[in-house]
Amino acid sequence: MSQSPPPAQPAYVLHSRAYRETSALVDFLTPQGRLRAVLRSARGKAGTLARPFVPLEVEFRGKGELKNVGRMESVGNATWMVGEALFSGLYLNELLIRLLPAEDPHPAVFDHYAATLLALAEGRPLEPLLRSFEWRLLDDLGYGFSLNTDINDEPVAVDGLYRLQVDAGLERVYLLQPGLFNGTELLAMAEADWSAPGALSAAKRLMRQALAVHLGGRPLVSRELFRKP
């Protein structure tokens, strides 16, 4: 009795690079996590689909960590982005490659990624989208912390000053020092109130601090795109 092929699953290409003569080594984001697979005949029709931001349906074969692409089809229009929206999409992809463990299912991350791509393509403001994605990714990976309470379970005070103890939470401090956050900013972040003065810039600093320890010492290449003229 012949064995039926594995079911196809929704996927996005995070990164692709040449592999051997005519193949490509592709990192995919799926509801089942980040999967790496060999795409054969990458110079043909399949190769034109193996690019970021195209909603795909992919059949993966093989039980090892390195799989093979059995079938790959587009299931919608590619998300068209240019300029800083494109750089933002590439930033999301690099974050996922660096932070998401291989074959560790995170369906909520997949859904939020797809929704964020659509919002970027629609021209929505970039900073709130990026901060929301970073925060939810950290939370889904188990690295999240409360913005309403500190590490002693005390409510964040509007007039308080706080520093981030990575993987622990917010600690109230009483002496000025670099890298602090005020309570007003933190409470605005908790409500996603990006109209509050200083909330977006503080959220960017907070996410940088929270992500840094998990990214290691190697800088994100995609961040450099924003700095180029």
Swiss-Prot record:
SUPFAM superfamilies: ArfGap/RecO-like zinc finger, Nucleic acid-binding proteins. This is DNA repair protein RecO. PANTHER family: DNA REPAIR PROTEIN RECO. It comes from the Bacteria. The keyword Protein transport does not apply. The keyword DNA damage applies. Involved in DNA repair and RecF pathway recombination. Keywords: DNA damage, DNA recombination, DNA repair. Belongs to the RecO family. GO terms for biological process: DNA recombination; double-strand break repair. One of its GO terms (cellular component) is bacterial nucleoid. InterPro entries: ARFGAP/RecO (IPR037278), DNA_rep/recomb_RecO_N (IPR022572), NA-bd_OB-fold (IPR012340), RecO (IPR003717), RecO_C (IPR042242).
